[in-house]
Amino acid sequence: MWKVSALLFVLGSASLWVLAEGASTGQPEDDTETTGLEGGVAMPGAEDDVVTPGTSEDRYKSGLTTLVATSVNSVTGIRIEDLPTSESTVHAQEQSPSATASNVATSHSTEKVDGDTQTTVEKDGLSTVTLVGIIVGVLLAIGFIGAIIVVVMRKMSGRYSP
């Protein structure tokens, strides 16, 4: 009877392996552009004052790029309309005139759709992998607890034969 349980366990986990393969991610800067890039010259980012060296026209070529801070001073004198942030952040910055930009580097991609330019913020795949790991862990825990309950119930009923 344990062969059936092992077979069900292997088949169940194989379906989870297929789902986990779809959650794999590539390098975080594969399809991103620096927002301050004009004419192939790297300019400091508006929100984090960071230059991305190595950005070129061939952006699909794989390679490692590093972020280099150009200054440690906070960014002032930037119009709020130029920053690619959500509306809740924009309202918070308008209410507080002494708000400064944080020194957090984010990835922004600029896409052109029907002549309009859309800026989106891309998240890394770590949250997806974490969520898949939690789901797999919970399912495995339920399976182990169920197997223990089945073994205990069989032993109590007298039908258990090792």
UniProtKB/Swiss-Prot annotation:
Assigned protein family: Belongs to the podoplanin family.
Name by which UniProt lists this protein: Podoplanin
GO biological process: actin-mediated cell contraction; cell adhesion; cell migration; lung development; lymph node development; lymphangiogenesis; lymphatic endothelial cell fate commitment; negative regulation of apoptotic process
Signal peptide start-end: 1-22
Primary role: Mediates effects on cell migration and adhesion through its different partners. During development plays a role in blood and lymphatic vessels separation by binding CLEC1B, triggering CLEC1B activation in platelets and leading to platelet activation and/or aggregation. Interaction with CD9, on the contrary, attenuates platelet aggregation induced by PDPN. Through MSN or EZR interaction promotes epithelial-mesenchymal transition (EMT) leading to ERZ phosphorylation and triggering RHOA activation leading to cell migration increase and invasiveness.
Membrane-side (Extracellular) residue stretches: 23-131
Region called Requires for dimerization and lipid rafts association, residue ranges: 133-137
Any GO CC annotation of this UniProt entry: cell projection
Glycosylation sites: 25, 32, 34-35, 52, 55, 65-66, 76, 85-86, 88-89, 96, 98, 100, 102, 106-107, 109-110, 117, 119-120
Biased composition, class Basic and acidic residues, residue ranges: 109-119
Record's subunit section: Homodimer. Interacts with CLEC1B; the interaction is independent of CLEC1B glycosylation and activates CLEC1B; the interaction is dependent of sialic acid on O-glycans. Interacts with CD9; this interaction is homophilic and attenuates platelet aggregation and pulmonary metastasis induced by PDPN. Interacts with LGALS8; the interaction is glycosylation-dependent; may participate in connection of the lymphatic endothelium to the surrounding extracellular matrix. Interacts with HSPA9.
The record's note on its domains: The cytoplasmic domain controls FRC elongation but is dispensable for contraction. The cytoplasmic domain is essential for recruitment to invadopodia and ECM degradation.
Chain residue ranges for the region called Disordered: 23-57, 85-119
Species, as recorded: Homo sapiens (Human)
Cytoplasmic compartment segments: 153-162
Keywords: Cell junction, Cell membrane, Cell projection, Cell shape, Cytoplasm, Developmental protein, Glycoprotein, Membrane, Sialic acid, Signal, Transmembrane, Transmembrane helix
InterPro entries given in the database record: Podoplanin_domain (IPR052684)
Biased composition (Polar residues): 85-108
